[in-house]
C-alpha cells in the first residue's frame, strides 16, 4: 500500500500529464529508436510500454528503428569488417543482404513483438512494403576534396515517401514500426540512415514531434555539457569546430530539416533513461536538446 507522500507524488505526476494528453491528442509523434534503448532488456520494455501508453491516450506514435549494433555483431560473426564514411555505413551487395536480414527480420520483428506483448498492435514494415519509401543512390562529398563524390554502395537517400500506408495504419489503431530500407525505381534496395528516414517521415506526416533517442543526454559541447537548445547558426558553428561529427551529423541534419519543414518540436534525448519518451512527451521536465529552425 502506498504511503501518503508517495501517493501524492504519483497523483501529481498523473495530473501533470493531463494537459499534454489533451494537447497531443490525435497528433503524430515520430520516434527514432536506437542506441542502448534497443539493447538493454529493461530499457526495451520501458520503451515498448511508453509507446503503447502514448497510443492508448490518443496519440499516433510512429517508430523508425536503427540496428547498427546488431548489424555489426553479425558482420563480425561472418568475418566482415564494417566501414563508415561521415556516419554512413559503406554497403556492398553482401552487406546489404545482411542489413535487410537484420533490420527487416530480426530487429523489426523483435520491436513489434515487444509492443504487442505490452498491449499494443504493432505492424512491422520496411520501405518495400507498399513501396512507400522511394530511394536513390547516395553519393557522399569527399571532405578533403569537395569536388569529388564518393560511392558508398547500396546506401540511399530518400526521393519520396508515400504516407498513405502509415496514415491507414494510424487510423486503424495500429503502431507502425519501420526499418529504414528504401527501394529505387529499378527495384534496387537501399540502406538509409534511420535518422534521415525518421526526419523525412515526420515532415511528410505533418508530425507534432520528432524524437531521436541516443546514447548521450542530448547534444554536448566540447566540455561534455548538455546543450538544451540549438539554432541553425549554432549547429553550423559546432560542425565547423568539430564538436559535431560522425554519427551525430546525420542526426542533427535530419532534426534541423524536420524543424525547418514545420515539425513543431524536434528533440534529441537520452535513450538510456528509463521512460525517457514519457518524460519528454507527458511531463514539464523536457529532457535532451531541442532543435529549432530559427
Swiss-Prot record:
Pfam families: AA_kinase (PF00696). Coiled coil: none annotated. The record marks 32, 251 as: Transition state stabilizer. GO terms for biological process: arginine biosynthetic process via ornithine; L-arginine biosynthetic process. It catalyses: N-acetyl-L-glutamate + ATP = N-acetyl-L-glutamyl 5-phosphate + ADP. Keywords: Amino-acid biosynthesis, Arginine biosynthesis, ATP-binding, Cytoplasm, Kinase, Nucleotide-binding, Transferase. Substrate binds at residues 67-68, 89, 191. Its EC number is 2.7.2.8. Its main location: cytoplasm. Pathway: Amino-acid biosynthesis; L-arginine biosynthesis; N(2)-acetyl-L-ornithine from L-glutamate: step 2/4. It is found in: Cytoplasm. One of its GO terms (cellular component) is cytoplasm. It comes from the Bacteria. GO terms for molecular function: acetylglutamate kinase activity; ATP binding. Belongs to the acetylglutamate kinase family. ArgB subfamily. Catalyzes the ATP-dependent phosphorylation of N-acetyl-L-glutamate. This is Acetylglutamate kinase.
Amino acid at each position: 500500500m502506498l504511503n501518503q507522500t508517495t501517493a501524492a507524488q504519483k497523483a501529481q505526476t498523473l495530473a501533470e500529464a493531463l494537459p499534454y494528453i489533451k494537447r497531443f491528442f490525435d497528433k503524430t509523434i515520430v520516434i527514432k529508436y536506437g542506441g542502448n534503448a534497443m539493447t538493454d532488456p529493461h530499457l526495451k520494455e520501458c520503451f515498448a510500454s511508453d509507446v503503447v501508453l502514448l497510443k492508448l491516450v490518443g496519440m499516433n506514435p510512429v517508430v523508425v528503428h536503427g540496428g547498427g549494433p546488431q548489424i555489426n555483431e553479425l558482420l563480425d560473426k561472418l568475418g566482415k569488417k564494417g566501414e563508415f564514411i561521415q556516419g554512413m555505413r559503406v554497403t556492398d551487395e553482401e552487406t546489404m543482404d545482411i542489413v535487410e536480414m537484420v533490420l527487416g527480420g530480426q530487429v523489426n520483428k523483435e520491436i513489434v513483438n515487444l509492443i504487442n506483448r505490452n498491449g499494443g498492435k504493432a505492424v512491422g514494415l520496411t520501405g518495400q512494403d507498399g513501396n512507400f519509401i522511394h530511394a536513390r543512390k547516395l553519393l557522399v562529398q569527399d571532405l578533403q576534396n569537395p569536388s569529388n563524390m564518393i560511392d558508398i554502395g547500396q546506401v540511399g537517400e530518400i526521393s519520396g515517401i508515400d504516407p498513405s500506408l502509415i496514415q491507414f495504419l494510424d487510423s486503424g489503431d495500429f503502431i507502425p514500426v519501420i526499418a529504414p530500407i528504401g527501394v529505387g525505381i529499378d527495384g534496387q534496395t537501399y540502406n538509409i540512415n534511420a535518422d534521415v528516414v525518421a526526419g523525412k517521415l515526420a515532415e511528410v506526416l505533418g508530425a507534432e514531434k520528432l524524437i531521436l533517442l541516443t546514447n548521450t543526454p542530448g547534444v554536448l559541447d566540447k566540455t561534455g555539457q548538455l546543450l538544451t537548445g540549438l539554432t541553425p547558426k549554432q549547429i553550423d558553428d559546432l560542425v565547423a569546430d568539430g564538436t559535431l561529427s560522425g554519427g551525430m551529423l546525420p542526426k542533427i541534419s535530419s532534426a534541423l530539416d524536420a524543424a525547418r519543414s514545420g515539425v513543431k518540436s524536434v528533440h534529441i534525448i537520452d535513450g538510456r533513461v528509463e521512460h525517457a519518451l514519457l518524460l519528454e512527451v507527458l511531463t514539464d521536465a523536457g529532457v535532451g536538446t531541442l532543435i529549432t529552425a530559427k
